[in-house]
């Protein structure tokens, strides 16, 4: 008998990158990653595939399935397949979304449930074990799974605050990729005292100033161009940042700012695409093939 599970989780944008201080903040965005799991007692290994990258590294999604099966003492094998609307290695939390969707789809397949934060922590553990993240990305994982705006303590894997928000989001996603595990941690740690100031702004609910300060700090530390941020500020945008460790930029925008900022970013000269989306508040879901949750 084959057990099947299906789930999706969302991407996220950065308010505070946690690499400098282990404290982070992020917001869910309405770009999805889907996972399909098929399991059987006749199989003994988990084999993963990523639709957009046939030769891509599948250790994360495979490890997520293995950890769920281990949690419930199940000896099953099979396949895990993911596909995504989120640009890979762009700072938009594609790994967190893939981990969350993989864990949730596996739970769906085996008919088990876990509390939301335990699901998130299992995906974070898988990400740490296979080396795709520096801090464990607990902030990104919470934003991806829970939706809304989250503030976290990544070192202790604590969710400090979550609230819903309503905003359009404009993203500039360069064609080049930047893998989180390759980022310059030493230079990021140099800016820790100033990132701490941005984190305090986030705790006070001043998310736009927090993310903009975060963006200038990390662009400086990691060598990314601040022109995209300055163009956003020229358009009247209050909240814009390098997302994650780059190379994407994300801005919280009003409806009447979308066209102007899109044009400003497209005229900057870097190859890439502008994505228009919004903050997602609803969080990850599992569903049957017909799409019912």
Swiss-Prot record:
Primary location: cytoplasm
Keyword Transferase: yes
GO MF annotation: an example: ATP binding
Organism for this UniProt entry: Methanosarcina mazei (strain ATCC BAA-159 / DSM 3647 / Goe1 / Go1 / JCM 11833 / OCM 88) (Methanosarcina frisia)
Protein known as: Shikimate kinase
InterPro entries according to UniProt: GHMP_kinase_C_dom, GHMP_kinase_C_sf, GHMP_kinase_N_dom, Ribosomal_Su5_D2-typ_SF, Ribsml_uS5_D2-typ_fold_subgr, SK_arc
Associated pathway: Metabolic intermediate biosynthesis; chorismate biosynthesis; chorismate from D-erythrose 4-phosphate and phosphoenolpyruvate: step 5/7
Database matches in Gene3D superfamilies: 3.30.230.10
Protein location: Cytoplasm
Enzyme Commission identifier(s): 2.7.1.71
Catalytic activity, reaction form: shikimate + ATP = 3-phosphoshikimate + ADP + H(+)
Family: Belongs to the GHMP kinase family. Archaeal shikimate kinase subfamily.
Keyword Kinase: yes
Entry GO terms, CC: cytoplasm
Lineage: Archaea, Methanobacteriati, Methanobacteriota, Stenosarchaea group, Methanomicrobia
Keywords linked to the UniProt accession: Amino-acid biosynthesis, Aromatic amino acid biosynthesis, ATP-binding, Cytoplasm, Kinase, Nucleotide-binding, Transferase
């Amino acid at each position: 008998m084959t057990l099947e599970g299906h789930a999706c989780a969302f991407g996220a944008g950065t308010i505070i990158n946690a690499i400098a201080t282990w404290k982070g903040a992020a917001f869910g965005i309405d770009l999805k990653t889907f996972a399909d799991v098929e399991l059987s007692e006749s199989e003994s290994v988990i084999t993963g595939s990523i639709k957009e990258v046939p030769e891509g590294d599948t250790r994360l999604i495979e490890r997520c399935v293995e950890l769920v099966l281990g949690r419930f003492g199940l000896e099953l094998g099979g396949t895990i397949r993911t596909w995504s609307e989120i640009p890979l290695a762009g700072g938009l939390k594609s790994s967190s979304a893939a981990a969350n969707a993989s864990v949730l789809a596996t739970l769906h397949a085996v008919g088990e449930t876990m509390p939301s934060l335990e699901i998130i922590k299992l995906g974070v553990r898988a990400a740490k074990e296979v080396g795709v993240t520096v801090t464990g990305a607990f902030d990104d994982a919470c934003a991806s799974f829970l939706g809304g705006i989250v503030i976290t303590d990544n070192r202790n894997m604590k969710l400090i605050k979550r609230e819903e928000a309503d905003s359009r989001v404009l993203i500039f996603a360069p064609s080049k990729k930047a893998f989180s595990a390759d980022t310059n941690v030493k230079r990021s740690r140099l800016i820790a005292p100033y990132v701490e100031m941005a984190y305090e702004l986030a705790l006070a609910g001043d998310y736009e100033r927090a993310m903009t300060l975060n963006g200038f700090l990390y662009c400086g530390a990691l060598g990314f161009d601040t022109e995209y941020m300055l163009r956003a500020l020229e358009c009247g945008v209050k909240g814009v940042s390098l997302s994650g460790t780059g190379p994407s930029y994300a801005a919280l925008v009003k409806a009447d700012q979308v066209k102007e900022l899109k044009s400003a970013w497209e005229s900057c000269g870097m190859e890439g695409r502008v994505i228009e989306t919004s903050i997602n508040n609803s969080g990850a879901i599992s569903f049957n093939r017909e799409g019912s949750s």
